[in-house]
Curated annotation (Swiss-Prot):
Stored PANTHER family: RE52028P
Entry protein name: Sorting nexin-3
GO terms for cellular component: early endosome membrane; Golgi membrane; retromer complex
GO molecular function, one term: phosphatidylinositol-3-phosphate binding
Binding site for a 1,2-diacyl-sn-glycero-3-phospho-(1D-myo-inositol-3-phosphate): R73, S75, K99, R104, R113
Alphabetized SUPFAM superfamilies for the sequence: PX domain (SSF64268)
A Pfam family annotated for this UniProt entry: PX
Family: Belongs to the sorting nexin family.
Gene: SNX3
Source species taxonomy: Eukaryota, Fungi, Dikarya, Ascomycota, Saccharomycotina
CDD domains membership: PX_Grd19
Organism: Yarrowia lipolytica (strain CLIB 122 / E 150)
Cell compartment(s), UniProt: Cytoplasm; Golgi apparatus membrane; Prevacuolar compartment membrane
GO biological process terms held by the UniProt record: endocytic recycling; late endosome to Golgi transport; protein transport
Domain PX: start-end pairs: 30-147
Alphabetically ordered keywords of this record: Cytoplasm, Golgi apparatus, Lipid-binding, Membrane, Protein transport, Transport
Length: 152
């Protein structure tokens, strides 16, 4: 029986290393999970507002805490976005969900806004230039004492 001819080097498959269980199912090298949840409406009549819980889980070193939970209202997001725009001129900051003037406390409006705020934060927090270059990003996501007046 004749030996099969050797394939040219370009066609040979490189040696494939078997991955261990830990490599397949372990914590990724860098991960960032941002969730906006649990909207709560406070106040009465013209003083009503809704705030949202921001949950962050990460192992990215620029974030001081591996996990955090803070609450922010829509006006905080507006201020945060303005600060990001001033701070990060090389990055196009995405829009927030639009302001709502009628039925703003209905379940549908609150849920749509929650989804929009979550998408906004995931996009902003996941941007490599903002992760390394923004001073306000980590504070907004993780500091329960965040005060917009410190940044204006």
């Amino acid at each position: 029986m004749e030996a099969s001819p050797k394939k040219p080097e370009a066609l040979q498959r490189p040696d494939i290393k078997q991955q261990s269980f830990a490599e397949i199912y372990g914590v990724p090298e860098n991960f960032l999970e941002i969730e906006v949840r649990s909207p709560q409406t406070h106040g009465i009549a013209r003083k009503m507002y809704t705030d949202y819980e921001i949950v962050c889980r990460t192992n990215i070193p620029v974030f001081k805490l591996k996990s955090s939970v803070v609450r922010r209202r829509y006006s905080d997001f507006e201020c945060f976005r303005e600060i990001l725009e001033r701070e990060s001129t090389r990055v196009s900051i995405p829009s927030l969900p639009g302001k709502v003037f009628t039925n703003r406390f209905s379940d549908e409006v609150i849920e749509a806004r929650r989804e929009g705020l979550e998408k906004f934060l995931q996009t902003v927090a996941g941007h490599p230039l903002l992760q390394t270059g923004s001073k306000v990003l980590c504070a907004f996501i993780q500091d329960p004492q965040w005060d917009k007046n410190q940044w204006i």
